[in-house]
Amino acid sequence: MSILSFLLGEKKKSASVAKERLQIILAHERTGHSAPADYLPALQRELVAVISKYVKIGDQDLRVSLERQDNLEVLEVKIEIPQH
């Protein structure tokens, strides 16, 4: 955040807020301090809210899953966007 943004009170874009939250969740998950995938329903709701600002989608149009294979975690987000 720049000094000018701080002084003028410029708000962050919702996409950057969502990105920061996702980075925090993934960093926290990597430390092994949380139960596996207990945050996925909340993450899905927040993603639907952010994406709905730009494209008309519902809860059923977005699916979030977390797969673990050995030391690798894959967070998969599938979004069905209706055609106009």
Curated annotation (Swiss-Prot):
Belongs to the MinE family. One of its GO terms (biological process) is regulation of division septum assembly. The keyword Transport does not apply. NCBIfam families: minE (TIGR01215), PRK00296.1 (NF001422), PRK13989.1 (NF010595). It comes from Cupriavidus taiwanensis (strain DSM 17343 / BCRC 17206 / CCUG 44338 / CIP 107171 / LMG 19424 / R1) (Ralstonia taiwanensis (strain LMG 19424)). Pfam families: MinE. HAMAP family: MinE. InterPro entries: MinE, MinE_sf. It comes from the Bacteria. Keywords: Cell cycle, Cell division. Coiled coil: none annotated. This is Cell division topological specificity factor. Prevents the cell division inhibition by proteins MinC and MinD at internal division sites while permitting inhibition at polar sites. This ensures cell division at the proper site by restricting the formation of a division septum at the midpoint of the long axis of the cell. The keyword Signal does not apply.
